[in-house]
């Protein structure tokens, strides 16, 4: 791959957990220590951990911790503490262009994550239905970068918390039949911390809510923000995607077709004709 005119090809920065850079002259030295939890697959319980350090030139940072985590598994349930690079659930990180909601373009953040990383067979369904998913709460670590990037003159945030959750359903018996269908919902929310907003010639600091109620409002989208004003909204910045994948697998090769529908509010979660909304007083109502 070559580049010119100071333009970096998309595939050199996407799906790399923040390892992309727009600087033409760059390099990095990486030190890593990891024990994969896969070593304990034969046991009911398992333990894994890892640390990845980076020293770089031509990146946004010169020295940082890319990953630092500990994880414990009991049967199907997995608890992860710390910053770990999580793969996309229904996308191939090497072949696809990424995910619209829970992608892998950014560096991992420190979080507490409870998950079913592998499909769990739903009882009494004759192995036709399987479930997996996760729930996580964490904290963003880009405060200094935001301030430097905006030079403190445009909107930025500090100390923002992060919540993500996802659930996936597989229909099929991949061990017996080559065809299967996977359906899912992915959601994310930024909440808490402080917002710095320009009002006239000055930047105004607004403290967002970050108590236990805010965690509830992030998990079950509800509440409101101090910056909402006259607009009806929920607490935090909520977004997500409906996702689907259709699979064909055999012993030699496999083929998958997938689709996303991104949304940022309740209206976008509904599969409707985009021209089906009213005007004027009915601008936020669906018109049949």
Positions of predicted regions on the chain:
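Residues that define the transmembrane beta-barrel architecture of outer-membrane proteins
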Residues: 23-29, 61-66, 106-115, 159-165, ...
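Short loop/turn motifs that connect adjacent beta-strands in outer-membrane beta-barrel proteins
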Residues: 36-47, 73-77, 119-133, 170-182, ...
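Surface-exposed coil loops of outer-membrane beta-barrel proteins
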Residues: 3-17, 83-170, 184, 191-232
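Surface-exposed loop and membrane-interface regions of Gram-negative outer-membrane beta-barrel proteins
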Residues: 42-74, 87-105
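Residues on the lipid-exposed face of transmembrane beta-strands in outer-membrane beta-barrel proteins
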Residues: 29-37, 68-72, 81, 112-118, ...
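Transmembrane beta-barrel strands of outer-membrane/channel proteins
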Residues: 1-6, 47-55, 72, 79-85, ...
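Long, internal scaffold/assembly segments composed of regular secondary structure
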Residues: 176-185, 191-288
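Outer-membrane beta-barrel initiation region
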Residues: 1-39, 235
């Amino acid at each position: 791959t070559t580049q010119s005119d100071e333009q970096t090809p998309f595939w050199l920065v996407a799906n790399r957990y923040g390892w992309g850079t727009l600087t033409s002259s760059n390099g990095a030295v990486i030190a890593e220590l990891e024990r994969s939890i896969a070593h304990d697959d034969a046991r009911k319980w398992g333990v894994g951990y890892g640390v990845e350090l980076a020293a770089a030139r031509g990146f946004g940072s010169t020295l940082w911790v890319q990953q630092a985590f500990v994880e414990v598994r009991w049967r199907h349930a997995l608890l992860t503490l710390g910053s770990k690079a999580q793969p996309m659930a229904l996308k191939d990180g090497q072949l696809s262009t990424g995910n619209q909601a829970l992608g892998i373009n950014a560096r991992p953040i420190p979080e507490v994550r409870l998950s079913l990383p592998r499909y769990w067979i739903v009882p009494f369904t004759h192995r036709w239905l399987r479930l997996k998913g996760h729930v996580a709460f964490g904290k963003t670590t880009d405060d200094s970068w935001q301030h430097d990037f905006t030079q403190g003159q445009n909107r930025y945030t500090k100390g923002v918390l992060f919540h993500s959750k996802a659930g996936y359903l597989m229909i099929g018996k991949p061990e017996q039949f080559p065809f299967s269908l996977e359906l899912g919902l992915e959601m994310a929310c930024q909440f808490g911390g402080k917002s710095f907003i320009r009002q006239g010639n000055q930047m105004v600091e607004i403290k967002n809510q970050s108590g236990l109620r805010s965690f509830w409002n992030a998990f079950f989208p509800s509440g409101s923000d101090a910056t909402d004003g006259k607009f009806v909204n929920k607490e935090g910045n909520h977004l997500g995607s409906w996702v689907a994948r259709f699979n064909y697998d055999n012993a030699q090769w496999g083929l998958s077709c997938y689709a996303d529908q991104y949304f940022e509010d309740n209206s976008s979660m509904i599969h409707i004709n985009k021209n089906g909304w009213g005007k004027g007083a009915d601008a936020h109502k669906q018109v049949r």
